[in-house]
Amino acid sequence: MRNYRTFDEFKADYFYEHPEEIDEFITIIFEEYAKDGDIKALLASLRTVSRVKGITAIAEETGLSRNGIQKALSENGNPYFESINAILHAIGFRLMPQRI
């Protein structure tokens, strides 16, 4: 039986090899979320970036537990606004309103 990587693993590997692409990826995922409101896709993308940046490092910087971050960004996650904001700050971003 062959072992295959999941798409999430493939994305994470890509960003490990191309960290310079993360900024544009974050911009795109929030643009897409603004258009379609697909929270699961947004959380999955943030989960990928968080894995690349390091869940432990993010936990230390945010004061959230590793488990709390993983739960917030899980497929069934329903994170608090403060959690998403803290995670974004830890990976070098901020939420900023923009007129539609």
Model-inferred region functions:
Residues 48-71:
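Short alpha-helical DNA-recognition segment
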Residues 62, 71, 85, 99-100:
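Proline- and acidic/polar-enriched loop/turn elements at helix boundaries
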Residues 74-75:
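Residue-level detection of the helix-turn-helix DNA-binding "recognition helix"
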